From Swiss-Prot:
Site location (Priming of reverse-transcription by covalently linking the first nucleotide of the (-)DNA): 63
Organism: Hepatitis B virus genotype E (isolate Cote d'Ivoire/ABI-212/2003) (HBV-E)
SUPFAM superfamilies per the UniProt record, alphabetical: DNA/RNA polymerases (SSF56672)
Biased amino acid composition, Polar residues: 223-239
PANTHER family tied to this protein: REVERSE TRANSCRIPTASE DOMAIN-CONTAINING PROTEIN, RIBONUCLEASE H
Region named Terminal protein domain (TP): 1-177
Family the UniProt entry places it in: Belongs to the hepadnaviridae P protein family.
Protein name from the UniProt record: Protein P
Activity regulation comment: Activated by host HSP70 and HSP40 in vitro to be able to bind the epsilon loop of the pgRNA. Because deletion of the RNase H region renders the protein partly chaperone-independent, the chaperones may be needed indirectly to relieve occlusion of the RNA-binding site by this domain. Inhibited by several reverse-transcriptase inhibitors: Lamivudine, Adefovir and Entecavir.
Length: 842
């Protein structure tokens, strides 16, 4: 007969009328009982032949993600002119006096940030903008291109001008070496000259006038900065041949090559690969009058393209280098010919724009390393778009980068730190990631861009032929004309005006500030904000400032104090170049909303929207149907967040964890579902731990247990010998139930860790409820007053220790001096799930 929910509650000792704990609790450690209950609740995970369920409510498996919806009216968010003060350490020292070693180390990490991937795979430009919305290809192309342009204008991206130079807007940093020697002309004259050449994005651009002279005088490709990482000998010798192929799939990401060391004969010998590339490009871009390939020493090898006579009528007209402007002189092919649109304006503006500053960069191929697409800014704001950058190549495969770990405050530390009677407000840092500058050496690895409208459309429309490889004939200009394209462009013309022309050109951009799609970025942001908060706390001793990523909170004793504090801190942050969004400052009163929790003087609880999600999840959870383990991962993710607030905590979810580990489907029995549902219906706050003196001690041997409560000693025996960890856990439970003390001394590390997931399942669930809110202090066995009673010696009375307990705030503690993390030691901070062996999602 299946186990009823009421009976199951009685087994777990969750009901009031349970028998004496000393008799009932050891039974829960019995393997036979655990096995029988697991069978009754269908937790044995037999291989199921019924088809698995792949969707539960909003939860779907990892391989069936929700389809994003395209919004043609997305607004591109505006970015302030973010420029973090380069001398940020001195600025802070003027404000608070000398910084600690820890703060300096963290601030130095991001000024500038560096990125050294193991290998970089270059992708063709067509993959620059992902065809995420097949029904809105053109619209998505222009919206994304506009977003990239906005980022470039805000100084967040570099624009690749040539193989070795880039331009950007905004204020330069000292590590960005400006090009001189007449390499680029300044002001309007330069713009005039550039637009005369109609060069596009440096993909086929003319070499800078002085680049060849300059390269002879420069020792390294990044100047003095980069000489810290010299190339090893073998690499130096080979670098010429390695760097000859633009699209070599992998290459050493760091190192310096002396550009002046190679001679002109190298260029000649390498022109074969240039010719090949040039031929490919001729075919793809037939109308450029000049192609060149920059050899790795900065000289340009030029090939002049004579329009072939086979092109027919096209060769009779003057050849434009711009696909868009060619339509002006062509006969309309239909009512939907693009020439109608192009003839609407006399002046379409320049083919390309250049930034105010030009710098040298390491050799950067005309490729991208990640695709981009747009999505809603967040579930609550669908009016604005957000750019998603896919640099997942750095997190995959054999050459994946293992990103540095960093301390995330756990719930108890957070509650100890923030649960108080302070008034709170949270600050919103606008575009937090885009505050932290990247070294230009990272540019070749973090490239985004687009192939230009003509190739993008041609690739996506199956009926158009891009190229006739056999005969080398030019594609017909009007191949891309279609009703859909014409209508889309006409509508976009209202939005973008003459910028349509600029955006239809190919472009390659590299990140100048840290992008969101790389695992290094969250680490750097966390280091940066924690250092800044540390400085703020020392500058304002009566204030509590705390941050996690870009979420910064300030607490003070009174509302008036908080307001004056807010003004001072805001001014300080602005003086460092940190941009705050005053409209999004939230005043919380005495209950702070932070990291998904509501934290008040009573402790912490999950925020309301999470509780609603959990109720929703249980409402839609099917019974007696095998659920795909990937969906179980999603369910456990949600329930695991709120587990510390339930009676039985993480142990209650162990059957689900086990099914995920074994990659089996999981079937919820009505009783197990009812049990979980009840668990999550009543949530209990996690309270702040209080300091105190330990008066109660517990100890156990495999056969018996002993307690020391004040001057009283107690002992008992188990019916059968138990594993030592289980015996110690039982002793701690008896100590809590007998004395009611919230502070217990024990010599067992597993009990101290308060993770009861490795014990027999029923015992883990019951112990979690009995020991909820209990703090443990470590006492060495030799000094443990409960050691003698546990061995059956009641007459011997050891003196009670004075063991003070100080609640921990973990690595997040206010003045924690965290030493630098040596790379060869195991991680000190684990994101372990409650399992002993943390499972990694596949």
């Amino acid at each position: 007969m299946p186990l009823s929910y009421q009976h199951f509650r009685r087994i777990l000792l969750l009901d009031e009328e349970a028998g004496p704990l000393e008799e009932e609790l050891p039974r829960l450690a019995d393997e036979d009982l655990n096995r029988r209950v697991a069978e009754d609740l269908n937790l044995q995970l037999p291989n199921v032949s019924i088809p698995w369920t792949h969707k539960v409510g909003n939860f779907s498996g990892l391989y069936s993600s929700t389809i994003p919806v395209f919004n043609p009216h997305w607004k591109t968010p505006s970015f302030p002119d973010i420029h973090l003060h380069q001398d940020i350490i001195n600025k802070c020292e003027q404000f608070v006096g000398p910084l600690t070693v820890n703060e300096k180390r963290r601030l130095n990490l991001v000024m500038p940030a560096r990125f050294f991937p193991i290998s970089t795979k270059y992708l063709p430009l067509e993959k620059g903008i992902k065809p995420y919305y097949p029904d809105n290809v053109v619209n998505h192309y222009f919206q994304t291109r506009h977003y990239l342009h906005t980022l470039w204008k805000a100084g967040i991206l570099y624009k690749r001008e040539t193989t070795r130079s880039a331009s950007f807007c905004g204020s330069p940093y000292s590590w960005e070496q400006e090009l001189h020697h007449g390499a680029f002309l300044d002001g309007p004259s330069r713009m005039g000259e550039e637009s005369f050449h109609h060069q596009s994005s440096g993909i086929f651009s003319r070499p800078p006038v002085g680049s060849s002279i300059q390269s002879k005088h420069q020792k390294s490709r990044l100047g003095p900065q980069s000489q810290q990482r010299p190339l090893d000998r073998s690499q130096q010798g080979r670098s010429g041949s390695i760097r000859a192929g633009v699209h070599s799939p992998t290459r050493r990401p760091f190192g310096v090559e002396p550009s002046g060391s190679r001679h002109a004969k190298n260029i000649a010998s390498r022109s074969a690969s240039c010719l090949h590339q040039s031929a490919v490009r001729k075919a793809a871009y037939p109308n450029h009058s000049t192609f060149e390939r920059h050899s790795s020493s900065g000289h340009a090898v030029e090939f002049h393209n004579i329009p072939p006579s086979s092109a027919g009528s096209q060769s009779k007209r003057p050849v434009f280098s711009c696909w868009w402007l060619q339509f002006r002189n062509s006969e309309p092919c239909s009512d939907y010919c693009l020439s109608h649109l192009v003839n609407l304006l006399e002046d379409w503006g320049p083919c390309t724009e250049h930034g105010r500053h030009h710098i040298r960069i390491p050799r950067t191929p005309a490729r991208v390393t990640g695709g981009v697409f747009l999505v809603d800014k967040n579930p609550h704001n669908t009016a604005e778009s957000r750019l998603v950058v896919d640099f997942s190549q750095f997190s995959r495969g054999s050459s994946r980068v293992s990103w540095p770990k960093f301390a995330v405050p756990n719930l108890q530390s957070l509650t100890n730190l923030l649960s108080s009677n302070l008034s709170w407000l949270s600050l919103d840092v606008s575009a937090a990631f885009y505050h932290l500058p990247l070294h230009p050496a990272a540019m070749p690895h973090l490239l985004v861009g687009s192939s230009g409208l003509s190739r993008y459309v041609a690739r996506l429309s199956s009926n158009s032929r891009i190229i006739n490889h056999h005969y080398g004939t030019l594609p017909n200009l009007h191949d891309s004309c279609s009703r859909n394209l014409y209508v889309s462009l006409m509508l976009l013309f209202k939005t973008f005006g003459r910028k349509l022309h600029l955006y239809s050109h190919p472009i390659i951009m590299g990140f100048r500030k840290i992008p969101m799609g790389v695992g290094l970025s969250p680490f750097l942001l966390a280091q940066f904000t924690s250092a800044i908060c540390s400085v703020v706390r020392r500058a304002f001793p009566h204030c509590l400032a705390f941050s996690y990523m870009d979420d910064v909170v300030l607490g003070a004793k009174s509302v008036q104090h908080l307001e004056s504090l807010y003004t001072s801190v805001t001014n300080f942050l602005l003086s460092l170049g940190i941009h705050l969004n005053p409209n999004k400052t939230k005043r919380w009163g005495y209950s702070l909303n932070f990291m998904g929790y509501v934290i008040g003087s009573w402790g912490s609880l999950p925020q309301e929207h999470i509780r609603i999600k959990i109720k929703d999840c249980f409402r839609k959870l099917p019974v007696n149907r095998p659920i795909d383990w990937k969906v179980c991962q999603r369910i456990v993710g949600l329930l695991g967040f709120a587990a510390p607030f339930t009676q039985c905590g993480y142990p209650a979810l162990m059957p689900l964890y086990a099914c995920i580990q074994s990659k089996q489907a999981f079937t919820f029995s009505p009783t197990y579902k009812a049990f979980l549902c009840k668990q999550y219906l009543n949530l209990y706050p996690v309270a702040r731990q209080r300091p105190g003196l330990c008066q109660v001690f517990a100890d156990a041997t495999p056969t018996g247990w002993g307690l020391a409560i004040g001057h009283q000693r107690m002992r008992g025996t188990f019916v059968a010998p138990l594993p030592i960890h289980t015996a110690e856990l039982l002793a701690a439970c008896f100590a809590r139930s007998r004395s009611g003390a919230k502070l217990i001394g024990t010599d067992n590390s597993v009990v101290l860790s308060r993770k009861y997931t490795s014990f027999p399942w029923l015992l883990g669930c019951a112990a979690n409820w009995i020991l909820r809110g209990t703090s443990f202090v470590y006492v060495p066995s030799a000094l443990n007053p409960a050691d003698d009673p546990s061995r059956g010696r009641l007459g011997v009375c050891r003196p009670l220790l004075r063991l003070p307990f100080q609640p921990t705030t973990g690595r997040t503690s206010l003045y924690a001096v965290s030493p630098s993390v040596p790379s060869h030691l195991p991680d000190r901070v684990h994101f372990a799930s409650p399992l002993h062996v943390a499972w990694r999602p596949p």
